[in-house]
C-alpha cells in the first residue's frame, strides 16, 4: 500500500496545498532573491499586491524555513515544517498543563524527585492528544492555521498569569504573535480566551463562596 512522504511517494500536496500554498512558498525564494518586492510581486498571476497574500498565508516565521531548501526540495521543507508545528503545539500545551498541575496540585516538599517526575509523566497523554487531534491532522493541508494551535496554550497560560496578578507580558506577547502570524485565526483565539477568562472568574468566585 502507498505510504506518506518522506518514506513513500504520497505527499500532502493535494487540493489547496498543491494549487495555492506550494506556489506561495515558492514565491518567498523570489522575494529573498530580489526578483520581486514585498509590495508588488510579478510572479503572482499577472502581478499584484503581495502584502495581503503574505499577511494571510506566509507571515509565520516557519514559512521562512522553506527558503533554506531549494524549490525542488519544497516537499521535504513543508513536511518538516508541518511536523515541527504539530510537535510544538504539544510542547506548548505541555507547558500549560504542567503550570496548572503545579498551581493546583502542589506536592509536599519532601516528595522525591522520582515521584515528582512520575506525577508529571501522568500528564503526558494530554499534550500528545492535543498535538495529534483531528484538527491538526486535517489542517496539515492548510498549515497556516497551525500557528494558532501552538500559541493558544500560551495565551491561556497568560490568562492564568493575569488572574494570579503577575506580569501581563505573559499574555501580551503570545497575543501579539498570533495576530502577526495569522490575523484570521487570531480573533477566534481571542474569543476563546475571553470565554476561558469568564469561566475562570466564575469558578474562582464559586470556590470563594464555598470557602466562606
PLM regions: where:
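Transmembrane helix-loop junctions and nearby membrane-interface residues
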Residues: 2, 68, 100, 201-204
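Membrane-interface coil-to-helix junctions
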Residues: 1-90, 128-149
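Membrane-embedded helix bundles of polyisoprenyl
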Residues: 86-99, 116-202
